[in-house]
């Protein structure tokens, strides 16, 4: 509880770091802020061509099926990979002044989250332009799904950022892990093609349920399965608590290691 109060007291610092990251992310580039939309759109085009044209995926409106899963996945993977280096990238700040170190991974994950929210504008534009339709009752559950994903991503980012201070290679390893994790999550394919004997393993992955919930709302236009959402939320809270525990244990010697 004391940690939450302290973080609340430093909320302005979190907002400032989020603004700084968003402004500095594409500083100096010609297209600047537009890269927020160009990167996921380019990935969407590549995956759509590969899976719907070359590999003959027969999913109806595959571009939409993929897009509503790809944007949340990019948020999650970016939170881990960018979050892993967050403490190291702010080492001067860590050495000079006191503040709750947890502020740093929180600000980086929040910055990635804001990027995802902006990309959702494009998702809704695609849905409207293509006439796919929207179930407004189902859309009301989107904030809950987003919060569940944010909690899980933050927990993982806390662990990654703290451990990376002591083991710098983790930052590079996580890039490989994120790529493998994506293919173990039904982002570019349907869970229905997974052999039944492997389904229990897939269902242990919180991102499987989170991606399913996004698809149920935005692609199938239905209210998501409450059981799946609760399972993902439970795992998300577990990793958040565990991540905070690991972070608090390791943060004591950040300054010396940096």
Would you name each region that the model predicts?
Residues 1-258:
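Hydrophobic transmembrane alpha-helices and immediately adjacent juxtamembrane helices
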């Amino acid at each position: 509880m004391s940690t939450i109060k302290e973080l609340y007291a430093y909320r302005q610092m979190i907002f400032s770091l989020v603004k700084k990251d968003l402004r500095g992310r594409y500083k100096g580039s010609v297209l600047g802020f537009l890269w927020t939309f160009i990167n996921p759109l380019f990935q969407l085009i590549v995956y759509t061509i590969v899976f719907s044209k070359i590999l003959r995926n027969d999913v109806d409106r595959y571009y939409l099926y993929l897009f509503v899963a790809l944007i949340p996945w990019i948020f999650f993977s970016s939170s881990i990979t960018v979050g892993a280096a967050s403490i190291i990238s702010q080492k001067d700040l860590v050495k000079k002044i006191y503040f709750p170190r947890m502020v740093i991974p929180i600000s980086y994950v929040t910055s990635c989250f804001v990027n995802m929210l902006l990309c959702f504008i494009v998702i809704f534009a695609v849905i409207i332009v293509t006439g796919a339709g929207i179930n407004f009752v189902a859309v009301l559950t989107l904030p809950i799904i987003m919060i569940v994903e944010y909690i899980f991503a933050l927990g993982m980012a806390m662990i990654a950022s703290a451990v990376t201070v002591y083991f710098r290679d983790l930052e590079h390893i996580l890039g490989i892990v994120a790529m493998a994790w994506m293919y173990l999550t039904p982002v570019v394919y349907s869970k229905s093609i997974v052999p039944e004997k492997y389904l229990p393993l897939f269902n242990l992955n919180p991102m499987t349920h989170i991606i399913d919930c996004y698809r149920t709302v935005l692609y199938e236009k239905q209210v998501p399965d409450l059981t799946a959402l609760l399972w993902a939320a439970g795992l998300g809270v577990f990793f958040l608590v565990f991540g905070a525990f690991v972070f608090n244990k390791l943060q004591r010697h950040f300054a010396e290691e940096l």
